[in-house]
């Protein structure tokens, strides 16, 4: 009986260690714009590399758009994004993107996911909805969302019910 308990405890300890050993993504650990952990969001993380050799690691396309706005004037060399399924970095410009669907997006009101192959993107759309898109369409949609968000900053409309006459 004692051996059984020891075996169970070892099995539980090993299983917990395996779950905790989630493979960390490339540096930086956290998004430079929002602070979200990039390993946790490995399926949406991005790396933008500029022609001057500098780069930024972000949690999502939303924070890439923020980075580009802050770095305006810098020429982009490449964009990489985590494949939704494998979390491996792939070329964001050649990835198949899905906009929308029922899965909640990362840092954006409308979800945007990248896939290494069309079969995976089609399967995602079939299960979760959304539509296939190019990187340029996804980036334009993200920039539009950010512009709309900026436009509404400082306009906290609480109604007029508290006015006293």
What residue ranges belong to the model's regions?
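N-terminal export/membrane-targeting signals
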Residues: 1-20
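Intrinsically disordered, low-complexity terminal tails/loops enriched in metal-binding residues
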Residues: 18-165
């Amino acid at each position: 009986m004692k051996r059984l308990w020891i075996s169970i405890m070892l099995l539980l300890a090993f299983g917990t260690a395996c779950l905790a050993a989630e493979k960390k993504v490339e540096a930086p650990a956290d998004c430079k714009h929002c602070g979200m952990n990039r390993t946790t969001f490995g399926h949406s993380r991005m790396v933008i590399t500029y022609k001057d050799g500098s780069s930024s690691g972000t949690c999502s396309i939303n924070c890439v758009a923020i980075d580009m706005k802050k770095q305006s004037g810098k020429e982009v060399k490449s964009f990489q994004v985590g494949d939704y399924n494998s979390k491996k970095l792939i070329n964001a410009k050649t990835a198949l993107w899905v906009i929308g669907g029922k899965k909640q997006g990362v840092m954006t009101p409308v979800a945007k996911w990248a896939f290494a192959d069309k079969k995976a993107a089609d399967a995602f759309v079939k299960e979760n909805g959304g539509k296939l898109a190019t990187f340029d369409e996804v980036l334009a949609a993200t920039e539009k969302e950010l512009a709309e968000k900026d436009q509404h900053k400082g306009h906290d409309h609480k109604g007029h019910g508290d006015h006293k006459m």
